[in-house]
Regions:
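C-terminal motif of bacterial Sec signal peptides marking the signal peptidase cleavage site
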Residues: 16-19
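Bacterial N-terminal signal peptides that target proteins for export
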Residues: 1-8
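Short, solvent-exposed beta-strand-terminating loops
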Residues: 42-46, 110
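Bacterial signal peptide processing site
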Residues: 21-23
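Extracytoplasmic/lumenal domain signature
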Residues: 26, 34-37, 53-74, 82-88, ...
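Solvent-exposed adhesion/ligand-recognition segments of exported proteins
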Residues: 38-39, 47-51
Length: 489
């Protein structure tokens, strides 16, 4: 693989007036000198549809261990994002790092503030600095990340940093009406579209209220111009958090915004519990899908449909599943309300299992799609591939037998969400390291030595490298191809 060194000159600091206050700081270091553009993975699962699929690579033949970064200043839950030969990663200590894609050396780091480490009504992540996956604006050459910052009243901030220097170009406080930081958490991945960064919020682990005040699901749209007013969507009822690690999905054809919610509290009489919700680019005009049995089997037992983010297969077809273990194909342009799915058939509804019959804590995070399969992790049941018919929307359920053309691999392992690249499905597990399975039939292609990961961690891939957050370091693995075939780009 040829690596070309390109000098990036220093960028002039730009003063932006923003509604909630902008902090412009000095460059933390001299401008970086990255390797030439070598693949990109600018958002959670690569694209706005969250396919998690890089279709541009030849078939992998073998894999070797590459660089491991120096220890970072905190744990990494967020997926790395990659652009222009640089791997960007963010920690629970509110620091963003830029690492050279070729060797893992630190090109710059930017500490955004002191993270909040106490004061929540409930929760299971401490501190909560940067938890959700950032997103890169490849045109404006910025990375956006949301950090919880300690203070007399702790606040969530959206930061926009210059890709080359880490200079802060945008800093906006996120405090929509009715928002209570003690019971709200930003875990889901950010999305960039329509001139906004979309930021999802849900409850903290434990589903706590602040007295009688509930948490809600929020999506905040922050204008990237730094001047226009923020926009907000809030779910109709208490609970209904937008907390899955995959976060917000955007349909690039309609520009509509989609996300999935957890259970309402209480369940009865609510309208957005365990739902897929579509809103306009300005977060208005919501339409919904809810399972026919949303109250009895999803809401009441806390079996959130929104434990994972949906994946767009096409503008008119999306797959979603959640903790109760049922999967659905829906039409994002016509979600259809309760029992409005395309598959399984609304007539005489019967759940289509996706995790070998599991009906509790079945799947989390997000999915990947590479025709004809949707790939998902199943808690304690390994990796599952579901064969999808896109012409007559349906898929082969993975019931306890998980019969062909579906496949299941990885035994009883609990993986993080999968991605697809070079004809392989890549997943990581805590203590087990990185695994790669043949995309067509689940044959094991590669197994690394064991290492630890945090909850819901998903890899990234760019330049024929698979990039995995491993607690306080980033680990990378290089793909090799048949003789005479090199990495594209």
């Amino acid at each position: 693989m040829k690596i070309r060194i390109a000098l990036i000159t220093a960028l002039i600091l730009m003063v932006l007036a923003v509604a909630c206050g902008t902090a412009i700081g000095p460059p933390p270091m001299s401008p970086l000198t990255p390797i030439a553009s070598n693949g990109s993975w600018p958002s959670y699962h690569r694209d706005n549809a969250h396919t998690g699929n890089d279709p541009n690579l030849p078939t992998v033949v073998s894999v070797s261990t590459s660089w491991t970064s120096a220890s970072l200043d905190g744990q990494v839950y967020a997926s790395p994002v990659v652009f222009g030969g640089v791997v960007y990663t963010a920690t629970l200590n509110d620091t963003v790092y830029a690492l050279n894609q070729a060797d893992g050396s630190v090109l710059w780091s930017r500490h955004l503030g002191t993270p909040q480490s106490s004061g929540w009504r409930c929760g299971n992540v401490t501190p909560t600095g940067i938890l959700g996956t950032p997103v890169i604006d490849t045109a404006a050459k910025r990375i956006y990340a949301v950090a919880e910052i300690h203070g007399t009243t702790p606040r969530y901030h959206l930061f926009g940093l210059d890709l080359a220097t880490g200079t802060t170009l945008l800093d906006q406080v996120l405090a929509p009406s009715g928002f209570d930081w003690t019971i709200e958490q930003e875990r889901g991945a950010l999305a960039l579209a329509n001139g906004y960064v979309y930021v999802p919020f849900g409850g903290r682990a434990g589903d706590c209220f602040n007295g009688s005040h509930p948490y809600y699901g929020f999506v905040v749209g922050v204008p990237i111009d730094g001047v226009s007013a923020q926009i907000t969507f809030r779910t109709a009822d208490g609970g209904e958090g937008i907390w899955g690690a995959g976060g917000v999905v955007v349909d690039d054809s309609s520009h509509d915004v989609l996300f999935a919610t957890g259970n309402a509290i209480p369940c009865a009489g609510t309208t957005m519990s365990d739902a897929v919700i579509r809103v306009s680019p300005t977060l208005t005009s919501p339409s919904t899908f809810e399972p026919q049995d949303w109250q009895a089997n999803w809401c009441e037992p806390d079996s959130d449909l929104g434990s994972a983010s949906l994946v767009l297969i096409s503008p008119t077809l999306a797959f979603t599943a959640g903790k109760h273990g049922g999967g659905f194909l829906v039409d994002p342009t016509h979600l259809g309300g309760v029992d409005g799915q395309l598959y399984p058939s609304p007539a005489g509804y019967r759940q289509a299992d996706v995790c070998s019959g599991a009906s509790s804590d079945a799947t989390f995070g997000g999915f990947a799609y590479a025709a004809p399969f949707v790939y998902l992790e199943c808690e304690g049941k390994g990796l599952v591939a579901l064969s999808v018919n896109t012409s007559t929307p349906s898929f082969s359920p993975c019931d306890p037998t998980c019969a062909a053309p579906d496949w299941r691999a990885g035994g009883g392992t609990t993986f993080g969400p999968p991605i697809v690249a070079a004809g392989a499905v890549w997943v990581a597990s805590d203590g087990g390291g990185l695994s790669a399975f043949k995309a067509g039939d689940g044959t094991l292609i590669y197994q690394s030595a064991g290492f630890g990961i945090d909850r819901f961690v998903t890899p990234a891939e760019a330049g024929c490298r698979v990039i995995v957050p491993s607690l306080e370091v980033i680990r990378t693995f290089v793909m090799h191809f048949a003789p005479g075939i090199s990495c594209p780009g």
